[in-house]
Amino acid sequence: MIIYVDGDSCPVIPIIKDICHKRDINYMFISDYNHNLKVPESNLFVVDCEKDEADFFIANRIDNGDFLITNDMGLASMVLGKKVTVLNFNGDTINTNNIDTFLFQRHVASRERRNNIYKSKFKKRTKEDDESFKNSLLNILDGR
C-alpha cells in the first residue's frame, strides 16, 4: 500500500509524515514546483504547473489497495473506480456512496463564484480539525 497525497495546499503534512514513519508506510506527496513542501525528497514527486498535472500523475499511478488524501473531488472521483481509499483533509472518507454529494457541492460553489457570490472564507484550521483527521486516518489504517 502507498499513501498518495495531493500535496498542494495540504494542511496535514506533519500528521501524515508522522503516522507513516511510525508505521513504516510508504507515502508519496505530489506537488507542482510552485509549492515548497517540507518532506524528504524520496517521498516527493514534483510535476509541472499545468492544470491538473498532479491529479493525472496520481490517477495514472494509484492502484487497487492504495490510499489517497486530497480535497480535490474531481481527483477523488477519478480514482474511486480503482478500489482506492480516499480521505479529505477534514478526515471525511470519500466513497461511491457520497462522491455525488461532494461533486454537487463543488458544482454549486463554482456556479456561485461565476456569479460573484462568495461565501465567507474558510475558518482557520484548529487543533481539533487536525485531531479529527489524525483519528480518521488511524481508524482506516487499523481497519475500523
Which residues does each PLM region occupy?
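Nuclease catalytic cores that cleave nucleic-acid phosphodiester bonds
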Residues: I2-R144
